[in-house]
Structures are given as structure tokens and as C-alpha cells.
Amino acid sequence: MAKHGAGKLLPLEGLRGIAAVVVMLGHMVRGLVPPGPGPLAPLNTLHERVLNGGASVTLFFVLSGFILTLPFGKDQRPARVVVAMLKRWPRLVFLTVVVCVISWALIWQSGDIYARAALVNHNWWMATHFNAPLAGADVSLVGALTDGLFGVFGPGDVHFDSPLWTMRVELLGSLVVFVAAPLLFLVRRWWVRLVVVAVAIMAVGTNPPVMYVADFLVGAVLGMLQAEGGLPVFSNRAAVLAVGAGLYFYCFSAGPVPVIYAPLKLLLPTANVAHYAWEASSALLMVALLGNPALNGVFGQEWGVRLGAWSFPLYLLHVPLMLSVGGAVLLLATPHVGVSVAVPLAAGMTLGLAFLLAPLLTEMDKIWTLGLGKIIRVPKSGN
């Protein structure tokens, strides 16, 4: 079977970007929309049924495992493993520090505006600084630098930006891939590879953050298939079926679910195992986009590439902006137009600023990454 060219990977950027937007929209609902009945109550239902942040984060992890595995298809030397490990923390830390400093500046400027906004929308997530309480935390510039450099990667400190909880998972999962991928490529029999991966997934268990390593291993398997030309080509009908199944698994919730999910809920009853369904979703969506020319063409267009490039900054920026700027808009607008109108205004301002800043952070990160690549490089074979 012919191998998929590097250009055929571009649709995954579009998929990553859409997943980031889903997370952002879900967080807008979770942090701004009042709980209980009311004009905006359908948004809470939409969040529960469609805007699945857990499935989106799983997709991020599976995509990371996929992309990080590909270079080892041609080079399994220990030198590549060492360089990959040395580069991973510096590669991630630049934007985490930048966003923690931005969040610190927003907190310094806006104070407890998020708490006052919570008195308007009666929203627990807003009241608790999006489940990252500031009480007792070091919210100084030094604290922001410490969190961005080390806290989010080690103990999982997320006082400044709660979505940064994914960073220690990203670092851990990446290191596992750097060790596992070259070893798995050396094993030529696929059934042995799959048995090893299945045992590893069972071994990591169902307790966070270690359980998310399974997502990276699923991505590694897909990456090995890609590197060895083993991903299938999908007809349009097969692609529709794969995407439909992928979306079915994507919308599966760790909480109450519609009757259509009853059989799946029996198999995956708790939050700690729900991500297995989301792994299946990620795999189905990825292979459909890579294997179907029509989907490949749609998601590989400029909009998808740009959105994918902005996805990480968007993911990191939106919550600090919502808690400060969004909270201020909610407070200022509610007396004049009511909560039902103020909430969309706050969400719109938050999302608009996130999309305005994301390209700048993307370019800054690109410069950082290029510089890092010049400093830490894989030695040529034979040197």
C-alpha cells in the first residue's frame, strides 16, 4: 500500500483546530452561562451533549502520540531518543510561561472581577477561578514564572490557567512515546506490537494523570501505521461511516447520557474509563481524514492549517481572558441588557481577543522552536 505523503498530514491540523474551538466554546458555556433553567439553559444541554472537552483533550493527546512517533519510523538511534527527550520540556515551556505571565497581568489588573461576575451568573466555575482557586496561591510575577516553568509540569499547579493541567500529561506521554516508539519499530510483527501496547494500556490503569498515557500509545500505533504505509484508503461511504462512528464516540459523556449510549455506558460507566471511547473517536476521525481524498482536501485547506497552528495558543489563552475581560463585560453589560445578552457578549469578547492574540503567540512560538532546533539537534548518522 502506498505511503501517505507528508502533505497528507495537513488535515490533522484542521482537526486539532476544531477540537480547540470545541474546548473554548465548552468553557464559555461552563464559565459564563448560569446554571439551571432560563433562556440560556439549552446551551448547558449543548455542552453536555456535544461540546465534549474531555474528548477534545483526548484527541490532542492521541495526535501528539501520532506526530511524535513518526520520526522514529526512519531513525531509532538512541541519539534521536535523547535529543527528543532533551527538547520536549523546552519546546512546551515557552508558551506555558508566556501565558502564565499574561494571566498574572490580567489578575493584577482585574483583581477579583471573576468572583464579582459569579455573583451575577451564579456560576461555580467562574466563582472558583475556573477550578483554580487563588486563595493561598502565590499570584505574584515570580509565582507565575514558577508555575509556567515547573509547577504545571511537576505537581500540576494551575493557579493561573486551569487548562494547563494537560501539560504534565503532555510531558509524561511524550517521554513514554520517545522510549516506546523506537522499540516498537524494531519489532516487526504487528501482533506482537499490539499485544505490548494493550498490556501497557492496561498497566497504566485508570487513575489520572498516568491513565492518559494510553492516549499517547494509541497515537503511537497510528503513527507506526502511517510511517509504514499501513493506514487504509477510505471510499466516501466508508469515510462517512467512520466519521459517524467517531462522532458517536466523541459525544459519549462521563456523566448522564441519552439512551443511545446505554450499551456503551455499561462498558464504560465512570469518568476514568470514558476516555477509551474518546480514543476510539480520535482514531476513527484521524484515519478517515488521512485516508479519504475528499476529507483530506477539505481539512487540509488554509483555514485548517491556520486554525491548527493557532490551536495551542487558543487553548491556553481563552480561560484567563474569560475570567478577566469576559467577567468585566458580564458585570458591565448585565445591568443594561440582562444576563441572557451579557453572556454572549462576554463570550464573544473573550473569543475575539483569543483569536486576535493567537497568531502573535504562534509566531513567537515558531521563532522559539526554530532557535531550539538549532541548539539541540540530532547528530547525523555515522558521526
Segments predicted by a language model, with ranges:
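Solvent-exposed interhelical
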Residues: 171-200, 225-236, 334-338
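Transmembrane alpha-helical segments and their boundary/interface "anchor" motifs
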Residues: 54-57, 72-135, 306-317, 322, ...
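C-terminal "closing" transmembrane helix and its immediate cytosolic amphipathic cap
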Residues: 2-3, 106, 229-230, 234, ...
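Structural signal for the C-terminal ends of transmembrane alpha-helices
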Residues: 69-77, 105-110, 180-189, 220-230, ...
